[in-house]
Amino acid sequence: MTMSIRIGNGYDIHRLVSDRALILGGVHIPHELGLLGHSDADVLTHAIMDAMLGALSLGDIGHYFPPTDPQWAGADSLVLLNQVNELIRAQGWRIGNIDSVVVAERPKLKPHIKTMRDKLANVLQLEPNQIGVKATTNEKLGPVGREEGICAYAVVLLVSSDPVN
């Protein structure tokens, strides 16, 4: 059976620490804490990449960019996102739309959402209106609510570029 659309979902969480930049959707967010990770720890971009890969049953970002590989240390997640986008395009698919949510108690992310959407759209060769980015809190519940980390969820709709796919 052939399908012309595929849907994937993604999730990522990283711990908040001092002496690290806070980068979400490729945007540097002013904050006294940043996210700890092997790359730049951009949870939003990581969740989107996992959703893209998951839609095509291609595994997760750890398979392509393992945290044990020194070449990805400090990597810009937008560069990795571009590589994942090239991979799905080579498989005959393109993004129809993305919906995502970042969960953080602080800082307030609303002032940065348009810039996040614009940066992601530029890398993915999409229009900003194809990318939804929302922000919410965890109402002080769990590790995100205690400000121990930030997480993100993403859903991606892929559309076949090939009518026989």
Swiss-Prot record:
Q: Does the keyword Lipid metabolism apply?
A: no
Could you say which residues bind 4-CDP-2-C-methyl-D-erythritol 2-phosphate here? 12-14, 38-39, 60-62, 136-139, 146
Pathway the protein contributes to: Isoprenoid biosynthesis; isopentenyl diphosphate biosynthesis via DXP pathway; isopentenyl diphosphate from 1-deoxy-D-xylulose 5-phosphate: step 4/6
**Which Pfam family is one of this chain's hits?**
YgbB
Q: Name one GO biological process term.
A: terpenoid biosynthetic process
- Keyword annotations for this protein? Isoprene biosynthesis, Lyase, Metal-binding
Which cofactors are reported in the record for this sequence? a divalent metal cation
EC number(s) for this protein? 4.6.1.12
Q: Which InterPro entries match?
A: MECDP_synthase (IPR003526), MECDP_synthase_CS (IPR020555), MECDP_synthase_sf (IPR036571)
Q: Which family does it belong to?
A: Belongs to the IspF family.
The name under which this protein is listed is 2-C-methyl-D-erythritol 2,4-cyclodiphosphate synthase
